[in-house]
């Protein structure tokens, strides 16, 4: 009797466990590999903990895909600008294992005056199949990220049911720019498997986020052979082809005052009081017409925008400030950067002398003894608007306001096509919520494959 009772109890518990697992599977189902798969068959975890089950299966989705697992490996490696050697080493090993010939190109650092400092810590990676060192098609992205490092993580929508495409991949570089790096590698591998007669090169550069030293180093080297007819640049474009982006001018303003006790301000000259009207004038240069001393606009790119991104001055509230500094980034919508510099300098000089008639405004490199009360220090990097090809059918076309490595690559030869494309949106790049979905990443791969196929057609003709 007791034995029969125990057997019945065991049977009831087993039935309840199966029912519980079935309920969880029904409530939280995930499309894996194109087919619905419940959580049945996953052993060693608590069947009543749906969060554990969900993360286990999301991890399975990533591990089952060459693209997704490569992307995860890249994002898990910290590669903030100037510290890219670890991710570079990983890529060298990965590409070598896929039968690419891989060349390492060291990239110098620059001191504050722009003088190169030799380094063997960071490097570009140039890869190609076999001995095809001068391919006609090159895919390129950058491997550095902005700070801070944010670890790789997976999450899913708050829903009883979701598909694998909905899995959200978060972390620094998931969008900018390791999504493009992963997609470009897989697109190249799939192309070469089908068309080994049309080689593809892969170029992954450092330092894009801090001035483009990686790309300019490649551009000035023997590796920039000029034999290519198509270059596909990777950046987050929401899978649209970018028809161009704004130009860039950066500058700083340094005002030299005279310190004094705050109780007797007339004995000194406040650098902060002098820089404020200058910045007010600078801030409106994109909003006023060129005829009134403003910066140009265009139908394609809209108006030129300025961002006063940094300002500091003084040492204490009871001291008249001896120095004030500001840094400004300008996104040019039209015109030559040298003309823009002239407009900016005139605006600063006019605002300064309006505030104080005897103010002296000079252009400086920022490292020599100042020859005026107010220094204008233009950055080493400056370029005008960048027009890019967008002639492949099947894509949305847009323009963007951010800078890229496109202008840093010196093009040799005629009729070279340049495309800018990639998964993810710039609106989350550089932020704490940088992320994209599995669906976005995989759709990005398909876009790269289309661009590569179009480039291959050009090579055949």
Curated annotation (Swiss-Prot):
Glycans are attached at residues 48, 99, 396. One of its GO terms (cellular component) is extracellular region. The keyword 4Fe-4S does not apply. GO terms for molecular function: metal ion binding; peptidase activity. Zn(2+) 1 binds at residues 176, 209. Gene3D superfamilies: 3.30.70.360, Zn peptidases. Zn(2+) 2 binds at residue 176. Binds 2 Zn(2+) ions per subunit. It is found in: Secreted. Its cofactor is Zn(2+). It comes from the Eukaryota. Pfam families: M20_dimer, Peptidase_M20. Belongs to the peptidase M20A family. This is Probable carboxypeptidase MGYG_04702.
């Amino acid at each position: 009797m007791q034995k029969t009772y125990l057997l019945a109890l065991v049977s009831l518990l087993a039935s309840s466990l199966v029912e519980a697992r079935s309920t969880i599977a029904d409530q939280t189902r995930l499309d894996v590999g194109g087919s619905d798969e419940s959580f049945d068959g996953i052993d060693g975890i608590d069947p009543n903990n749906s969060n554990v089950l969900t993360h286990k299966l999301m991890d399975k989705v990533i591990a089952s895909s060459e693209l997704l697992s490569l992307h995860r490996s890249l994002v898990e490696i910290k590669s903030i600008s100037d510290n890219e050697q670890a991710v570079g080493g990983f890529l060298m090993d990965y590409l070598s294992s896929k039968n690419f010939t891989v060349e390492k190109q060291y990239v110098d650092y620059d001191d504050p005056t722009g003088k190169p400092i030799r380094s063997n810590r960071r490097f570009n990676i140039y890869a190609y199949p076999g001995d095809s060192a001068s391919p006609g098609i090159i895919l390129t992205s950058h491997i550095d990220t902005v700070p801070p490092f944010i670890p790789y993580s997976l999450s899913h929508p708050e829903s009883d049911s979701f598909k694998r495409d909905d899995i959200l991949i978060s972390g620094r570089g998931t969008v900018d720019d390791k999504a493009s790096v992963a997609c470009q590698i897989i697109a190249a591998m799939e192309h070469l498997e089908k068309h080994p007669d049309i080689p593809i090169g892969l170029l992954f550069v450092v330092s894009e986020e801090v001035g483009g030293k990686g790309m300019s180093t490649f551009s000035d080297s023997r590796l920039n052979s000029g034999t290519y007819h198509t270059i596909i640049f990777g950046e987050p474009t929401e899978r649209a082809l970018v028809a161009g982006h704004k130009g860039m001018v950066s500058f700083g303003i340094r005002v030299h005052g005279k310190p004094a006790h705050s109780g007797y301000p007339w004995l000194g000259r406040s650098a902060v009081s002098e820089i404020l009207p200058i910045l007010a004038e600078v801030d409106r240069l994109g909003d006023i017409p060129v005829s009134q001393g403003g910066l140009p606009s265009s139908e394609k790119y809209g108006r030129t925008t300025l961002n006063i991104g940094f300002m500091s001055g003084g040492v204490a509230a009871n001291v008249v400030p001896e120095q004030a500094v500001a840094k400004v980034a300008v996104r040019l919508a039209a015109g030559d950067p040298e003309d823009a510099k002239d407009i900016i300098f005139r605006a600063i000089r006019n605002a300064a002398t309006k505030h104080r008639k005897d103010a002296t405004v000079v252009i400086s490199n920022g490292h020599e003894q100042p020859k005026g009360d107010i220094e204008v220090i233009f950055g080493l990097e400056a370029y005008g608007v960048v027009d890019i090809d967008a002639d492949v059918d099947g894509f949305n076309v847009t323009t963007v306001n951010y800078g890229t490595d496109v202008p840093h690559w010196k093009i040799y030869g005629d009729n070279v096509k340049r495309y800018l494309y990639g998964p993810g949106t710039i609106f989350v790049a550089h932020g704490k919520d940088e992320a994209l979905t599995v669906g976005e990443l995989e759709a990005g791969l398909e876009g790269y494959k289309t661009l590569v196929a179009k480039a291959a057609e050009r090579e055949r003709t």
